[in-house]
Curated annotation (Swiss-Prot):
It catalyses: apo-[citrate lyase ACP] + 2'-(5''-triphospho-alpha-D-ribosyl)-3'-dephospho-CoA = holo-[citrate lyase ACP] + diphosphate. The keyword Transcription regulation does not apply. Keywords: Nucleotidyltransferase, Transferase. Disulfide bonds: none annotated. GO terms for molecular function: holo-citrate lyase synthase activity. It comes from Streptococcus pyogenes serotype M3 (strain ATCC BAA-595 / MGAS315). The keyword Nucleotidyltransferase applies. This is Probable apo-citrate lyase phosphoribosyl-dephospho-CoA transferase. Its EC number is 2.7.7.61. Pfam families: CitX. Transfers 2-(5''-triphosphoribosyl)-3'-dephosphocoenzyme-A on a serine residue to the apo-acyl carrier protein (gamma chain) of the citrate lyase to yield holo-acyl carrier protein. GO terms for biological process: prosthetic group biosynthetic process.
Amino acid sequence: MCKDTYFSGEAIQLSDMLRAREERALRQLHLLKEYPEGSLLSVTMNIPGPIKTSPKLLEVFDIVIKAIQTALADDKICYQLRLLPTTGYEYYLITSLPSRDLKLKMIALETELPIGRLMDLDVLVLQNDLPHSISRTVLGGSPRQCFICSKEAKVCGRLRKHSVEEMQTAISKLLHSFFNKDNQSSSSDKTG
């Protein structure tokens, strides 16, 4: 499966992305204030380049959302919102689960799912009246690894160590492998 299969959506401008980030921060703040007793999960995808959406990326996004809902099946979910802007898919969930426990579940999910590395599963709390993300390292988790070289992702991102083309190719390979495995297990389920 070629890269175009995954990156076939509409290209966006930097100004669109900046506006979307601002709107996301406002939405997060609103939800944290509206549900002060709950924990907020904000889900987006790590998709480099000007194309943030496509039918296949939406399929990946929805697979992860379903996995989140399954992981939280025993916990009270107070609110859910799924948005599909061209600037990248967004999902918000408020649960009664303490934020620390929610973050630990999301770290486990990111690790267990082969496509978990493509997601930002941010657990947010209010700090000085602003949304603040709980870091995986604060909870004893290791920093996220780069798709390409397995070094710390933040360092590679800050240094722009890899081109958009390299990252998209790595993501395409990951997704191709994921969907092929998924299709093989579906086929063997039917023949078994």
